[in-house]
A protein has these predicted regions:
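Short amphipathic alpha-helical segments
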Residues: 98-100, 147-149, 312-313, 360-363, ...
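Metal-dependent phosphoesterase/phosphodiesterase active-site architecture
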Residues: 1-63, 68-86, 134-135, 141-143, ...
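Catalytic-core regions built around general acid/base machinery
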Residues: 108-129, 321-344
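Core catalytic region of metal-dependent phosphoesterases/phosphodiesterases
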Residues: 66-160
Length: 463
């Protein structure tokens, strides 16, 4: 949307670092790993478990109804049987405003909050989850809004209502302040603590020893903050990596493959990409692959590296995310050598495209070959359709093009007028026991068609 301002990547990184006191002396003294958390639910060592996935949810009511609330109510039917929820970003539209968290997040997902009284909704910056609600930021969670535009929207709202012109409810006087609202909701927001308060806080909440340092102890119902905008946790001997793709979703002029292959970063790299995060992911994937106690790996991020949705198939942000993630995976293969399995990662989960899609890459000639890609971005925002001309993703190969990924299943907007169908979705993923786990992916659909809502569970995918 043209009136929204996407801050520079360097600004996103700097502001988010300041909010979590990145690499502060108090962190170094205690050997704290600010990218690691441990879910303290007493069940994290069990090998068979289930979790939920949704994304692009916080849109609020639409002219025909409230799909976000419908999906949230359906989601609640699976909550008791699942250990945690992964949110793939765009938590609140259009620009992550604090003014919209009550209506577009807190109220729909009260079942996930310790305080569930509709008359006493908690403040957005004091939320406490009764089950792990693990998010990564999307582009809308970072957007800013020009002050003048916000005032114009507010001033014109009464006139639009009088003239019976649709009113944009997802635009208020404020934007996200470069992700500040998201950080206050989900992250361990440390910037405002005194040195004494910080010391006491770290002693109380960073208590889990891991091979990478002291980790944040995530306690459902007691302390439910994330240590950083990107992070890792281990559950059921599977490593989960949550990424902030909004800081590596823009093209750069250089080839990053040799950068990621090198042992150390150079000092003259372009600032419009998050090299630190990409190197972190590279190193953590290598360590995970070399750890005999880890039996699988799942990555989740906002921007889908592979997608056939009509508005995202050729989007620069998605193409950049693919290119940069590929650099990382190629570097991982180079470091692990002949021991590198195929695929390197068991599942890659994303959002951004307003649909559900399952794709599989072919032999791309890179570290992202033969991977399973699940796009889960149809949980509340306006749905989009599949590109009408293709069900594959192609790349230039010299003067020709070649297929690099094939869509296996697409669930999105269909038809028009009286024949229009709007299937909103979320996923339940059942992780089975075993040295090499299988994943039973169960898509749940709440469809609006012919002025009626229906619920269904699609056939499971065995991955």
């Amino acid at each position: 949307m043209g009136f929204l301002l996407d801050p520079p990547i360097s600004q996103k990184i700097q502001k988010m670092r300041s909010r979590v006191r990145w690499n502060a002396q108090a962190m170094r003294e205690r050997a704290i790993d600010q990218t690691r958390l441990q879910i303290a639910d007493g069940l994290a060592t069990t090998s068979a478990f289930s979790f939920l996935v949704m994304g692009d949810s916080g849109f609020g009511p639409q002219p025909f109804g409230h799909p976000q609330q419908v999906v949230a109510d359906y989601l609640a039917t699976q909550q008791a049987d699942c250990r945690f929820l992964l949110h793939t970003g765009d938590v609140v539209y259009q620009m992550g405003s604090p003014d919209l968290y009550a209506a577009n997040f807190i109220e729909p997902y009260q079942q996930w909050l310790v305080t569930g009284d509709r008359d006493q909704l908690p403040s957005y910056c004091r939320l406490l989850f009764n089950q792990p609600f693990l998010a990564v930021p999307g582009n809308h969670d970072y957007y800013n809004l020009p002050t003048l535009y916000g005032f114009l929207v507010a001033a014109l709202r009464p006139l639009r209502q009088y003239l019976n012109v649709p009113v944009t409810k997802n635009v208020t006087l404020r934007g996200s302040a470069t992700g500040d609202t998201y950080a206050r909701v989900f992250l361990d927001y440390l910037r405002e603590l005194s040195p004494e308060q910080l010391t006491a806080h770290l002693q109380q909440h960073y208590t889990t020893a891991t091979e990478t340092g002291q980790a944040l102890t995530y306690q459902p119902g007691s302390f439910t903050r994330l240590p950083n905008r990107y992070y890792q946790f281990r559950y059921g001997d599977i490593d989960f990596f949550g990424l902030d793709s909004s800081t590596f979703n823009r093209p750069v002029e250089i080839d990053g493959a040799p950068v990621l292959a090198a042992r150390e970063l150079g000092s003259d790299l372009p600032a419009n990409i998050d090299w630190t995060q990409l190197c972190w992911l590279r190193d953590r994937l290598v360590a995970s692959l070399q750890n005999p106690q880890v039996r699988g790996r799942i990555v989740y991020l906002h921007h889908p590296p592979y997608i056939t949705e009509v508005t995202k198939l050729h989007e620069t942000a998605c193409l950049s995310a693919r290119r940069h993630l590929r650099w990382v995976l190629d570097a991982v293969v180079q470091r692990v050598g002949n021991e590198a399995p195929t695929p390197l990662i068991d599942l890659v989960l994303s959002g951004h495209a307003h649909c559900f899609e399952y794709l599989r890459t072919v032999d791309t000639g890179h570290g992202d070959r033969e991977l399973n890609w699940l796009v889960c971005g149809g949980s509340g925002a306006r749905l989009r359709s599949q590109h009408p001309d293709t069900t594959t993703v192609e790349e230039a190969d010299g003067v020709d093009t070649r297929v690099v990924a094939k869509s296996q299943l697409f669930v999105g907007r269909q038809g028009a007028g009286a024949e229009k169908r709007l299937p909103y979705s979320f996923l339940r993923i059942d992780v089975q026991a075993g040295d090499r786990p299988q994943f039973v992916v169960r898509p749940f659909v709440a469809e609006y068609a012919q002025e009626t809502w229906t619920r269904s569970e699609l056939p499971s995918l065995m991955l």
